Amino acid sequence: LHDQVFSSKHVALERESAGEFARRTLDQYEAAMYVRSNLPSEAHLLLIGESRPFYFDRASLSPYPFHEHPLTGWTREANSPKDLLDKIRREGFTHVILNTTEFRRLNAGYHLFNFTGPEAMRQDHILKQLPGNMTMLFSKNHVYVFEIPLSH
């Protein structure tokens, strides 16, 4: 069973295309193909819960899970979801990629966005409001592509 599900030998034997294999084994692949086909080449992506930027083929920030994500610091500094969105925009990002499945896995192991102290609940609330302040362009396999509005 492992060989049937994960093996790429079918690609080498030309029984399956590389794209079909990637689509079947990588949850972010179809979102990445959407980005490549629909977003301008100058798009700048902020990846959240996604540490595999290769297929997106756009300038991006995708921190390793064992490093603090810049979004953590920006959230601590923000007074509102609008402040956070404005900061992301000022940093030059045009789009956000959110992989919720991978985010949960990484957060469980690396505690990506664990806020502490008296402001923790407020900071968590600001971060959770972020998706609702952007425009969703694509969603599949729990991977979302958002556009950051020019103004809010």
Regions found by a protein language model. Give the residues of each.
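Active-site charged/polar residues at nucleotide-handling catalytic sites that mediate phosphoryl
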Residues: 91
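Short secondary-structure junctions
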Residues: 128-139
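Membrane-proximal, lumen/periplasm-facing interface regions of secretory-pathway glyco-
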Residues: 1-34, 50-53
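Short hydrophobic/aromatic beta-strand or adjacent loop that forms the aromatic wall/cage
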Residues: 140-145
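Extracytoplasmic
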Residues: 36-41, 46-88, 96, 104-129
